[in-house]
Every structure is written in structure tokens, then in C-alpha cells.
Amino acid sequence: MIDAFFIAGTDTDVGKTVASKAILDALNMKGLRTAAYKPVAAGSEDKGEGVQNSDAIHLRAVANVELRYEEVNPYALLMPASPHIAAEAENVVIDYSVLSEGLASLKEKSDVVLVEGAGGWRVPVSKDDCLSTWVQQEKLPVVLVVGIKLGCLSHAMLTAEAIQHDGLEIIGWVANRVNPGTENYAEIIKMLEDKMPAPKLGEIPYMPSVKRKNMGKYIHLEALDN
């Protein structure tokens, strides 16, 4: 079993956190000590316990290694915008060494760390750099989450090409049905199965947020065991 991997999305709002929770559930069912890491998150809120991001809160709740919030999400930005815009507005410089130190600490405390990105693969964290540069530095294998909707085929193939161009391995992909009315669902899945350079880890059906529990049954982890 690999000790850490990165969850990338074909876009923002494609269900990275939903897929991450499902994967964490599946890893928990295997008896592994799991940690979740959301290095950078925008659109956070301060509800009296410091600035926290809802996605990071959800991930922290599902992973079974108990961690302080700051260990899960070192950079929680308030503005609901691209991280580079939010960081500049808040006079924050996202330091890759901080991200790397946090990841190393979580590796020591767990069997496997799920690292969830922000937005799409090439999301900027400053005017000059993207989060993908840090993922390259860490040489993290990637699981790609595809939000199944019109246009997702091009987004998925282009994202996969970019990840591979960056010299990283895609170890699997997850289909997340973000729109119950999407037509030609089966045909879209078949094309992705044919074109993606990695195995499908699972398909997550569309469901209201209140029913998003025990989702590990939708994930098959064989690819992560290599």
C-alpha cells in the first residue's frame, strides 16, 4: 500500500471531497490508519474556532487518525476564489516547505495519507506557481475525480495528459455523478474506461448530501495495493 496519494479533480465542484470520503471509508474498512490532508482551501469561514474549511472538516471527520484541524488544513483562506487570489487578498504566502513538513508529519502518524487538492489540476496558488508543482516535488501518485456531466470527457483527458506530462503516475480514477439528469451516462463511462490511463476505482451515484455516508462500498482499492 502506498503511504500517500493526491486527489485531483477535472474542475472545481466535481466532487473531490465526496470521492475522498468514499476512498477514506474504503481504506478504513481495510483496517488502515488513515489521515486526510487538505493543504490549501479557499472559501473558509470563522465560526468562533478559527478559520476552517468545510471540506477539510468533512475529511478530518472521516479519517480515523485524530488530528488537530491545523494539521489537516494548514492554509485556510476566507475568500471563495482561486487560492492565489484569496491568498493575495489576505497577505498569505503559501510556502511549499510548510506543506511538505505537514505531509511528512501525517505520514509518521498513519498508514496512508489522502491529500486532496483545490480546484482543478493547474490551480494557481500564487501569480507564479500552481499547487501541481508541489505535488510534483512530493512525487505523489494521483487519483483523478471526474464529475460526470456534459464536457467531462475533454476535461478528463486533458487533465490526465497534464498529470502525465508533469511526470506523475495516475493510479486510478473515480466517476462521480454530479447531475442525475446527465444523458448518455453509460456511454460516457465507457469512453472514460477506454481512454483513461489507469483503472476505474469506482462510480459514486448522485445522492443528496444527507445520504453521503458509508460510501466505501462504491470504491475498489485494488490499484492502490500495488
Curated annotation (Swiss-Prot):
Record carries keyword ATP-binding: yes
Documented EC number(s): 6.3.3.3
Keywords, ordered alphabetically: ATP-binding, Biotin biosynthesis, Cytoplasm, Ligase, Magnesium, Metal-binding, Nucleotide-binding
Function of the protein: Catalyzes a mechanistically unusual reaction, the ATP-dependent insertion of CO2 between the N7 and N8 nitrogen atoms of 7,8-diaminopelargonic acid (DAPA, also called 7,8-diammoniononanoate) to form a ureido ring.
Gene Ontology terms, MF aspect: ATP binding; dethiobiotin synthase activity; magnesium ion binding
Record Pfam families: AAA_26 (PF13500)
Record note on quaternary structure: Homodimer.
Involved pathway(s): Cofactor biosynthesis; biotin biosynthesis; biotin from 7,8-diaminononanoate: step 1/2
Active-site feature positions: K38
Positions with a binding annotation for ATP: D13, V14, G15, K16, T17, V18, D55, E116, G117, A118, G119, N176, R177
GO CC aspect terms: cytosol
InterPro entries: DTB_synth_BioD, P-loop_NTPase
Source organism of this protein record: Aliivibrio fischeri (strain ATCC 700601 / ES114) (Vibrio fischeri)
HAMAP family assigned to the protein according to its UniProt record, in alphabetical order: BioD
Binding site residues for Mg(2+): T17, D55, E116
Top EC category: ligase
Cofactor(s) essential for the protein: Mg(2+)
SUPFAM superfamilies in the record: P-loop containing nucleoside triphosphate hydrolases (SSF52540)
UniProt name for this protein: ATP-dependent dethiobiotin synthetase BioD
One GO term of the biological process aspect: biotin biosynthetic process
Record's subcellular location: Cytoplasm
UniProt similarity note: Belongs to the dethiobiotin synthetase family.
Transmembrane regions listed in the UniProt entry: none
Keyword Ion transport: no
Alphabetized NCBIfam families for the sequence: bioD (TIGR00347)
